[in-house]
From Swiss-Prot:
GO terms for cellular component: membrane. Belongs to the cytochrome P450 family. GO terms for molecular function: heme binding; iron ion binding; oxidoreductase activity, acting on paired donors, with incorporation or reduction of molecular oxygen, NAD(P)H as one donor, and incorporation of one atom of oxygen. It comes from Oryza sativa subsp. indica. The keyword Oxidoreductase applies. This is Cytochrome P450 90D2. The keyword Oxidoreductase applies.
Length: 490
């Protein structure tokens, strides 16, 4: 973990950025503390508001939130207020908006399960600029359900899982064999390289080559703008990211046009674009499809590689878990070799302890710390009023690290999932409701395949590395491990 000193020194730059952000965002000035109420102003409504404070004028409690986010324990912001107010649901003022923060599993589940008649997505302005109005993250109602359903169905398809499994095996085997004994393998870097190209092929059908490399470079330029200041002047971070997105969109829309021109009516979808254009809806325009293909590339750059990297870190720190995972995977490999069969995606997903390791990594790592929604009407839940126009911050991290829900929550313990129920609302690493991440099965599969090939190919000694939690979760050094190849009879 990052030292406490480093965790609290780093926010100096972030604090400056946040101050500029809040000053520049017009919405901040429109939502002063007194103007952020329910709009009714009556004593009864005020009494039902969650306990809490709006903090400082204009900036609210944003600066302390960001400072905690950079520390080894980002949940300290929420934990402090839970104790102070005696409630896991409290009010605050974050990123320019009056906000209800919930670390209550029941309230969080209610918000996630609610539809656009109660809550709609809310994101920082720079992110909404980059995502575009057609993004699955921002659209609502029937169109959102249609896009989510089509993409989710394709991601769950045996065709895509079989293709992804073969592609990962084809990429991982030579990549891992290129590391000689005692060399350093940076897990995060390798995972990003492998996962991105494979997922892009599944999304838009693009094969490895010059265009893939150009797309990868443009995507790198695009993604760093997601948490930038909302200034679109030439030369700014947001402007450069928007220009990169335009270049990606031109490539993807060309692919869409080519696919529409040659598409046979009865052909099976080979990628996500095929699935969407096959729906035949006039609402699924080329712009909407390209926007969503770009959005769906984000897990390949961010969440899936980080999931893999965190799993390796946690396993390296828990030799007993690493040994059990090795044994499970080696036994599967031997059994399939003796049968003369190639591992299929169902084989990887059948590895029960490997799945427990991935689940525990998701809980402890909290790759997605939480989500924000905006109330479109007054909403009441568990006696708390969330006024119309307020944001609600569903903070997954505090729920996943709640000692009333998990014994020794800061301990990596994959065995806890042998008996634990994942459907009770206290485990939500992929969100929930109509906006449940459509790629959750693929994320598990990719992590399972990577871990299988790693533990059956190498022994390793991990070098020291630290988790950085803000603005996104990552390993500071990319998780370097010093590898030694295993013999076939190991």
């Amino acid at each position: 973990m990052v030292s406490a000193a480093a965790g609290w020194a780093a926010p100096a730059f972030a604090v400056a950025a946040v101050v500029i952000w809040v000053v520049l965002c017009g919405e901040l000035l429109r939502r002063r503390r007194r103007g952020a109420g329910s709009g009714k102003g009556d004593a009864a409504a005020a009494a039902r508001l969650p306990p809490g404070s709006f903090g400082w004028p204009v900036v609210g409690e944003t600066l302390e939130f960001v400072s905690c986010a950079y520390s080894p324990r980002p949940e300290a912001f929420v934990d402090k207020r839970r104790k102070l107010h005696g409630s896991a649901v409290f009010r605050s003022h974050l990123f320019g908006s009056a906000t209800v923060v919930t670390a209550d599993a029941e309230v969080s589940r209610f918000v996630l399960q609610s539809d656009a008649r109660a809550f709609v997505p809310w994101y920082p302005r720079s992110l909404t600029e980059l995502m575009g109005k057609s993004s699955i993250l921002l659209i609502n109602g029937a169109l959102q359900r249609r896009v989510h359903g089509l993409v989710g169905a394709f991601f769950k398809s045996s065709h895509l899982k079989s293709q992804l499994t073969a592609d990962m095996r084809r990429r991982l085997s030579p990549a891992l064999s290129s590391f000689p004994d005692s060399s350093l393998l940076h897990v995060q870097h390798l995972a990003k390289s492998v996962v991105f190209e494979i997922l892009v092929r599944g999304l838009i059908g693009l094969e490895a080559g010059e265009e893939m490399q150009q797309l990868k470079q443009q995507f790198q330029e695009f993604i760093v703008g997601l948490m930038s200041l909302p200034i679109k002047l030439p030369g700014t971070r947001l402007y450069r990211s928007l220009q990169a997105k335009k270049k990606m969109a031109r490539l993807i829309q060309r692919i869409i046009r080519e696919k529409r021109a040659r598409r046979a009516a009865a052909s099976l979808p080979r990628d996500a674009i095929d699935m969407l254009i096959g729906d035949g809806s006039d609402e699924l325009t080329d712009e909407l499809i390209s926007d969503n293909m770009i959005d769906l590339m984000i897990p390949a750059e961010d969440s899936v590689p980080v999931l893999i990297t965190l799993a390796v870190k946690f396993l390296s720190e828990c030799p007993l878990a690493l040994h059990q995972l090795e044994e499970e995977n080696i036994q599967l490999k031997r059994r399939k070799t003796d049968m003369g069969e190639t591992l299929q995606w169902t084989d990887y997903m059948s590895l029960s302890f490997t799945q427990h390791v991935i689940t525990e990594t998701l809980r402890l790592g909290n790759i997605i710390g939480g989500i924000m929604r905006k109330a479109v009407r007054d909403v009441e839940v568990k006696g708390h009023l969330i006024p119309k126009g307020w944001c609600v911050f569903v903070y997954f991290r505090s729920v996943h690290l709640d000692d009333t829900l998990y014994d020794e929550p800061y301990k990596f313990n994959p065995w806890r999932w042998k008996e634990k129920d994942m459907s009770n609302g206290s485990f939500t690493p992929f969100g929930g409701g109509q906006r449940l991440c459509p790629g959750l099965d693929l994320a598990r599969l990719e992590a399972s395949i990577f871990l299988h090939h790693l533990v059956t190919s190498f022994r390793w000694v991990a070098e020291e590395d630290h988790i950085v939690n803000f603005p996104t979760v990552r390993l500071k050094r990319g998780m370097p491990i010093r590898v030694t190849a295993k013999e076939d009879d190991d």
